[in-house]
Every structure is written in C-alpha cells, then in structure tokens.
Amino acid sequence: GTYGYPTPAVKKIESYYDVPEGVDIRGRYDAEFAKILTKDALKFVADLQREFRNHIKYALECRREAKKKYNEGALPEFDPATTYIREQEWVCAPVPPAVADRKVEITGPVDRKMVINALNSGAKVFMADFEDALSPGWENLMRGQVNLKDAVAGTISLHDKARNRVYKLNDQTAKLFVRPRGWHLPEAHILIDGEPATGCLVDFGLYFYHSYSAFRRTQGAGFGPFFYLPKMEHSREAKIWNNVFEKAEKVAGIERGSIRATVLIETLPAVFQMNEILYELKDHSVGLNCGRWDYIFSYVKTFQAHPDRLLPDRVLVGMTQHFMKSYSDLLIRTCHRRGVHAMGGMAAQIPIKEDPVANEVALELVRKDKLREVKAGHDGTWAAHPGLIPACMEIFNNNMGNASNQIDTVKREDGANITEQDLLQIPRGARTMEGLRLNTRVGIQYVAAWLTGSGSVPLYNLMEDAATAEISRVQNWQWLKYGVELNGDGLGVKVNKELFGRVVEEEMARIEKEVGTEKFKEGMYKEACKIFTRQCTSPMLDDFLTLDAYNYIVVHHPRETSKL
C-alpha cells in the first residue's frame, strides 16, 4: 500500500461507511463514527483535498528547499520581495465581538471529559486540539469529532460510572477554537484517490461541515467557526488555509470572513513572515500566538548544520533570552499594528495537590511569567490545566483594567527596531548532564504514552505535549552530533554515543522504578526507547518525530469498511 502501510484484503462485511467516489476508509467501522463520516461530509473533505493537494505538495517541497539552504549555511531572513507588505499600513478585518476577550485560553485534547471540563473551566477560550496534544489514532480522531459535534450542539454529556458523576455543560462556556494537524501529517485511515488524505483537511473538514451552522448561531454570534493553525513556516502555507476557508464559506453559503483563525508562530522561518501571514489571512485572521517549545525545536532544526548555534539546557531557554524576547516583542508589535490579538505562550504547570509548598513555588513561576506577558502587551495567554486559570486571569485583569484586549493601547513601536540579528541571537547558558538526562527520560515517557493513545501527558508536574518530545530529541541529537562538552557541572564530559547509551540505560531503569515494574511491562516503554534513541542517534535529523512514530499507530482493518 501507499507509504508501506499494509493493503487490506477486500472482504464484504455487513456494516460499512457509505463513501463518495474515490474515497476509501480503512479505519474501524463504528455506528457513532458513521454519523461523522457521512457521504456528504466525506465529499466535502475530498473536494478540499483534490483542489488543494498540489498546492500542499508544493508548499512542503518549498520547506525542503529552505532546509537545504539552511544546511548549506544560509540564515532565515525577512524576504526582500515582500518589503511592501511589511512597510505599508493595512489592517486585518475587525475582531469578532464574540472573541474580543481572550485573556486566558485553556488547551487540551478532544476526549469527552476534557472537552466538557475545558468548556466549563472559566477560561475565555478552549482550544480543542487534534494536533500536539492528541495521539492521532483512528479512535482518538473520530471520537474527538463526535465530541466536538456534540459540544457545539450543546448536548455533550458523560456519565462517569466509576465516580458516579454526570458531566455536562454549564450555561456559560468558553469559546471553542479547534486546532487541526499541520500540513505535513497524513491521515492514513482515509484514502482519497488512492492517497492518504491530508490530516488537517480531515480535521478541519469534518468539524466544519457538521458544526458551522450551530456554531455561528450560538458560540460565534454570527461568526465562526474559529481555528488555531499550527507549524506553518511561510505565508504561502497561510494562503492555502485562506483559500480553504473561502471555499468552505462558499460551499456553506456563509459570508466571506466568517471563519477566523489564530496562527501559531512556532517555527523560526515563520517569525520573519508574520506580516505576510496576517496579510494572506487578512479577512480570516484573529491574531498570532507564541508557541515557545516548538519555536525552540525549530531553532535547533533550522540550524542543524550550524555547530556555532548550540543550545544550552532547554530549561534555560526561557522567554527572557534575547532571541525569545525579540520574537515575542515583534509578534506583539506586528499583531497590534494589524489590529489583531497577540497571544502569549503556555503555562504547563500542573497544581501539586500533595505538596502545598512546591505548589506555591510553581504558581509563583506562572504568575511571574504571565505578568511579563501582560506588561509586554500580550492580549491573553495559554494554560494547560484548569487549576491555573484563576491565577492567570487575575494577573491579566489586574493589568488590563476593564479592557477586553490591548490591541489599541499597547502598540510596542519599539518593536520596529528588532533585527534579524536579534531574532537569531544565540542563547546563553550551560549544558549539563542533568539536561541530557531530563530530555531522555521525558522524551521516552512521552513517546510511550503517545504510542498507547495519549498525546497530553503529565510528567514531573508539567503537562507535556509533542513539542516537548521534539525539543528533547533534537537537542540530544545536536549535542551528540557535535560532541558537545557538558560545561555546566564541572565534569567536562563530552557527549558521545557511549555516554548517551549509558544515560538511556540508566534513565530507563529510573522510569521503571518511578512507574513500577507492572506498568513498565504493560506500557510501550521499550518501543518508545527504540524510536527515541534512533531519532537521537541517526546521522540525518528527522523533520518530525510524530511522522516517524505515526506508522506504529496506524491500524488498517483487514475487513473492508467502506463499500467500493
């Protein structure tokens, strides 16, 4: 089969998905899923795929070209060809009233209980995630679609028998944004004209098709649906999204500019394209967001062939590092100049119930970080756990008066002087054995959870998603490739394969001790260790860990589940 996935044997069975011409479903049949995978909804997805697949292939080809240039020594830069877009005065369409106030946004995967709790959390926005917080197996994706459809309809509920509790929506809920996958991820359970569908078009298309009408009536107050767009590297990728939105609006018969999206600036090339990205999405934009971990991951990836740009321990690469501060300042200036939200980054801390002292220390860190954001001019921020919402909300409320946002009040004209050198400045700090160990034990545990269906994983009192595993593996890769000296702990040890092998062995023993032998045997820790270690030691750096690990979770049903 395509991409070396097994080609299923054709056997007729009683229940199958009713599919349009050219669409073939290889995921398990389920009557609930069939309400999502209707013939019309699949036709909508297939039409998007057919119209845009060549543009998507071209955009991904351009990513490879850019990578080649960086590997030959080039640095990312502002594009001279689009100077006029950066210099002219223009603004995006006005912000829809329903989402003027986004002071605190909670993020999380699309499982049923999470969706209910997040919508009820008291945050202004819930970003329901099909991307880094979700392991994209068939069941997770399709259940997620069912959950969002029910959430928008207002009917979502859950009876937790173990706790004897019924979960349902409050009268007041957060506004729903949905984050589809990035352009590079395939959906191997749905074939269109014999090729795997583009993951994000499946995520976007199925959700939009079933929910746009109810969403605009309720949540969006005449606008919407709302989206978050991940991992873009260039404005040409934003242009494809803009065209997808316009096509969807046309098919649905809703006004142009109804659909709105916030773009995550979480790759190094994209920071030089912020004006251009907003310009492409002018009628469909509701701002940009700082995706910190992925941005650092992208810094390492972009400079994989530049030994002069080694990172210190990742815990030291905070927002106060010059290149990170420059990135967030430029993002705020750009968004406010163009009339849209500049969203702050993630607070990943999880409340530590069993240790009030440690909990207070963690909360203090969150408060400090959020205070920095609101003072810099951010309009809102992210939290991974509902327990952080009150602290974040308080900081933003106290520092913004009664305003919904700071778009008109904090212009950050000083951001006009931020240069390419500022954005690329090499971060300072030491490299330590503990840095290498932490990357290894967190990376392996994250991949193990991902392989067993969890994409959002609590580890050492932080809520981790795929971005953490990515930065962990590329940093290990970089240190190994260049044999860096661990200068931070006075031992002067150089990182090499032998040392890394020993670290992996010791960290695996530590993980087993921490999770218990039983769980260690049941979990996919050995497989995860193989994948993670291979990624850290391979001669060439893989673009995405999730792309490599995806092959392990694709399950093609041997029975044919859609009629030919």
UniProtKB/Swiss-Prot annotation:
Gene3D superfamilies for this protein: Malate synthase, domain 3, Malate synthase, domain III
GO biological process: glyoxylate cycle; tricarboxylic acid cycle
A family per Pfam: MS_N
EC code(s) of this entry: 2.3.3.9
Major location category of this protein: other
Annotated keywords: Glyoxylate bypass, Glyoxysome, Peroxisome, Transferase, Tricarboxylic acid cycle
UniProt cross-references to InterPro entries, sorted A to Z: Malate_synth_C_sf, Malate_synth_sf, Malate_synthA, Malate_synthase_CS, Malate_synthase_TIM, MS_C, MS_N, MS_N_TIM-barrel_dom
Subcellular location: Glyoxysome
Top-level taxon in the UniProt lineage: Eukaryota
Motif (Microbody targeting signal): 562-564
Transmembrane feature ranges: none
Residues forming the catalytic site: R179 (proton acceptor), D465 (proton donor)
Major enzyme class: transferase
GO cellular-component term (any): glyoxysome
Reactions listed under catalytic activity: glyoxylate + acetyl-CoA + H2O = (S)-malate + CoA + H(+)
Recorded metabolic or biological pathway in which this protein acts: Carbohydrate metabolism; glyoxylate cycle; (S)-malate from isocitrate: step 2/2
Family statement drawn from the similarity comment of this UniProt entry: Belongs to the malate synthase family.
PANTHER family assigned to the protein according to its UniProt record, in alphabetical order: MALATE SYNTHASE (PTHR42902), MALATE SYNTHASE 1-RELATED (PTHR42902:SF1)
Name of the featured protein: Malate synthase, glyoxysomal
The organism of origin for this protein: Glycine max
Organism taxonomic ancestry: Eukaryota, Viridiplantae, Streptophyta, Embryophyta, Tracheophyta
